C-alpha cells in the first residue's frame, strides 16, 4: 500500500499544468470607407462671401435701335437680381459682351457701345468711338478697372450701364450674349477690406515724419499729323457730285518721338444737296491743355482702282463765302482764348483745270492757323471741322467720265500739337516742332456741337437714303435737316 501511494504522487508531480489563454475579440473592418466631407471653397450661406458667374441674352434689336443694359438691382438678369436679394454688397469684376449679327449682307451702319459707370448717361448720347459693324460679329471684354472704381457697391444701387446705339436701318441687326462674374458679401464679412481687430492701446505715437516732396512728372506733349480724306462720286465736270458715307479717318499720332497710325471717328455736320461739312473727333484726357493747329486745305481728288489708281484727277473748289476750318467743343470740353487766322486763295480766272476756268469766289486753298486753351473735366472729345465740300457743278474741276465713279477727296494737310498745362510738371522733353510765323487774332470761340454729337443719320450710313445717282443723272431730293433725328437746333443758325 505505501508503495502504490508513493507512485501516484510521483505521477501527479510529473504531469504538466494546463494554461488557458483568452484571446480578445477582433473588430471586423468596415465594408466601405467613410466618405470625406467636401467643403465649398468659394463660400456660401448668408453670413459669408460668394462668387457667381452669370449669363444672359439681350435682343434681338433693330439697326437703328438705342438701348441700355443695366447691371445691378435694376438688371433684367434673374441670376443677378436673385443673388443681390440675399446679400448686402456686391461688385461685378468681369464682363464680356458678344454681338451676334443677324443683319443681311446689304445692310449698312454700325453699333456703337459704351460702359457708363456714372449710370446717368443716355444711349442716344453714345458717340461712334467703339463700334461693331452691323454685318459682322464682334465682342468686347471689360475688367474691374473699367466697370467701376469702388471696392463694393450697395445691393440697392446699380454699378454701371452698358449703352448702345445703332446707325443702321429698321431691319433686325442682331442680339447680345452677355456673361460676367459677380462677387457678393454681407456687411458682417468684409474679406480683404476688413478693418484690423482692436488690440491693446499702444500708447502715444511719435509724430509722423514730414511727407516727401512729390517728384515732378513730365508734362505730356503729343499731336496728330496727316491728310484726312473721304469718298465721293462724280462723272462729267458739268454735273454735280455727291459724297459717300463717312465714319472715320486715318491720322498719325506722335508722342515722345514715337509714331503710330490711328483711326479717329468722323462724320458730316451737314449733308444735303448743296454741300457736306465733314469733321473728325480728337480724344482728350482729363486736364488742361494748350492746342496749336495748322491746316492747309486743298481738296484734291484721286482715282480709285483701274489703271490710274491713286492718281490726281482734279479738285473740288471752295466757296469763299462759307466758313473755313474751325476747332469746336464736343462732349465734356470747354474752349477758351481762341485765336486764329484764316486764308482762302482763289483760282486765277485765266487758269484752266480739265477745260474749266475759275469763276469768282472759287477757292483753291483754305488755310488755318489757330491756338486755344482746352479744359476737360473727364475723358472726352473735341472736334476739328473742315470747310464744306461743295456739290454743285460750279465747283467741280475733276476730269470727266461717262458715268458716276467713286473717288477719294483729300481735305488737306492737318497738324495738331497738344501741350499739357501742369503747374507741378517739368518741361516737356520734346518741343522741336516748327511753327509758322503768323499774328493770331483773337476771335470768337466757334459754337460747340449739340449734345450727343451730329452724326450723319440721313445720308452717312445708308447709301439708299443719300443724294445719289441714277441712269438719268443726279437724283434731287428735298433738303434734309442739318442736325440729328432729335431735331436739335443748329448752333450756326
UniProtKB/Swiss-Prot annotation:
Annotated InterPro entries: Luteo_coat, PLrV_ORF5, Viral_coat
Keyword tags: Capsid protein, Virion
Comp. bias intervals (Basic residues): 1-18, 32-42
GO molecular function, one term: structural molecule activity
Region of interest (Disordered), ranges: 1-50, 189-218, 445-493
Protein name: Minor capsid protein P3-RTD
Positions of region (Readthrough domain (RTD)): 191-493
Functional note: Minor component of the viral capsid involved in aphid transmission. The RTD domain of the protein is exposed on the surface of the particle and determines the vector specificity and tropism of the virus. The RTD domain is not necessary for virus stability in the host hemolymph.
Compositional bias (Pro residues): 195-215
Record's signal peptide: none
Family, similarity comment: Belongs to the luteoviruses readthrough protein family.
UniProt superkingdom: Viruses
Organism classification: Viruses, Riboviria, Orthornavirae, Pisuviricota, Pisoniviricetes
Any Gene Ontology CC annotation: viral capsid
Residue spans of biased composition, Basic and acidic residues class: 484-493
Organism: Pea enation mosaic virus-1 (strain WSG)
Cited Gene3D superfamilies: 2.60.120.20
Further comment found in the protein's record: This protein is translated as a fusion protein by episodic readthrough of the major coat protein termination codon. It is composed of the major capsid protein fused to a long C-terminal extension called the readthrough domain (RTD). Readthrough of the terminator codon TGA occurs between the codons for 189-Leu and 191-Gly. The N-terminal region like those of many plant virus capsid proteins is highly basic. It has been suggested that these regions may be involved in protein-RNA interaction.
UniProt cross-references to Pfam families, sorted A to Z: Luteo_coat, PLRV_ORF5
Amino acid at each position: 500500500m505505501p508503495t502504490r501511494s508513493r507512485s501516484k504522487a510521483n505521477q501527479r508531480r510529473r504531469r504538466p499544468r494546463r494554461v488557458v489563454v483568452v484571446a480578445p475579440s477582433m473588430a471586423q473592418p468596415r465594408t466601405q470607407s467613410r466618405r470625406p466631407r467636401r467643403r465649398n471653397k468659394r463660400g456660401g450661406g448668408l453670413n459669408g462671401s460668394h462668387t457667381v458667374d452669370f449669363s444672359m441674352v439681350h435682343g434681338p434689336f433693330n439697326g437703328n435701335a438705342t438701348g441700355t443694359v443695366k447691371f445691378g438691382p435694376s438688371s433684367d438678369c434673374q441670376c443677378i437680381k436673385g443673388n443681390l436679394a440675399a446679400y448686402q454688397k456686391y461688385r461685378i469684376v468681369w464682363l464680356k459682351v458678344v454681338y451676334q449679327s443677324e443683319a443681311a449682307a446689304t445692310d449698312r451702319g454700325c453699333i456703337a457701345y459704351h460702359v457708363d459707370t456714372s449710370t446717368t448717361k443716355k444711349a442716344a448720347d453714345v458717340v461712334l468711338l467703339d463700334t461693331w459693324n452691323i454685318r459682322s460679329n464682334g465682342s468686347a471684354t471689360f475688367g474691374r478697372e473699367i466697370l467701376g472704381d469702388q471696392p463694393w457697391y450697395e445691393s440697392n444701387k446699380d454699378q454701371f450701364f452698358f449703352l448702345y446705339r445703332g446707325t443702321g436701318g429698321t431691319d433686325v441687326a442682331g442680339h447680345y450674349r452677355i456673361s460676367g462674374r459677380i462677387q457678393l458679401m454681407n456687411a458682417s464679412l468684409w474679406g480683404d477690406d476688413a478693418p484690423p481687430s482692436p488690440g491693446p492701446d499702444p500708447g502715444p505715437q511719435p509724430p509722423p515724419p514730414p511727407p516727401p516732396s512729390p517728384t515732378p512728372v513730365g508734362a505730356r506733349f503729343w499731336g496728330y499729323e496727316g491728310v484726312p480724306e473721304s469718298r465721293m462720286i462724280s462723272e462729267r465736270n458739268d454735273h454735280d457730285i455727291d459724297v459717300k458715307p463717312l465714319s472715320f479717318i486715318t491720322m498719325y499720332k506722335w508722342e515722345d518721338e514715337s509714331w503710330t497710325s490711328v483711326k479717329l471717328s468722323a462724320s458730316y455736320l451737314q449733308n444735303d444737296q448743296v454741300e457736306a461739312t465733314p469733321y473728325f473727333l480728337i480724344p482728350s484726357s482729363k486736364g488742361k491743355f494748350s492746342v496749336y493747329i495748322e491746316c492747309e486745305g486743298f481738296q484734291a481728288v484721286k482715282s480709285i482702282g483701274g489703271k490710274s489708281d491713286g492718281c490726281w484727277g482734279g479738285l473740288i473748289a471752295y466757296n469763299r463765302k462759307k466758313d473755313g476750318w474751325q476747332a469746336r467743343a464736343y462732349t465734356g470740353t470747354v474752349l477758351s482764348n481762341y485765336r486764329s487766322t484764316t486764308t482762302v486763295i482763289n483760282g486765277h480766272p485765266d487758269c484752266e483745270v480739265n477745260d474749266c476756268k475759275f469763276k469768282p469766289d472759287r477757292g483753291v486753298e483754305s488755310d488755318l492757323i489757330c491756338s486755344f486753351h482746352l479744359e476737360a473735366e473727364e475723358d472726352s472729345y473735341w472736334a476739328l471741322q473742315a470747310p464744306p465740300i461743295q456739290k454743285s457743278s460750279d465747283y467741280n474741276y475733276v476730269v470727266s467720265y461717262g458715268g458716276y465713279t467713286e473717288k477719294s477727296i483729300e481735305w488737306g494737310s492737318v497738324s495738331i500739337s497738344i501741350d499739357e498745362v501742369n503747374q507741378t510738371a517739368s518741361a516737356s522733353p520734346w518741343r522741336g516742332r516748327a511753327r509758322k510765323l503768323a499774328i493770331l487774332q483773337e476771335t470768337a470761340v466757334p459754337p460747340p456741337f449739340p449734345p450727343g454729337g451730329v452724326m450723319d443719320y440721313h445720308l452717312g450710313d445708308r447709301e439708299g437714303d443719300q443724294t445719289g445717282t441714277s441712269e438719268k443723272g443726279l437724283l434731287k431730293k428735298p433738303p434734309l435737316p442739318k442736325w440729328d433725328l432729335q431735331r436739335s437746333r443748329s448752333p450756326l443758325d
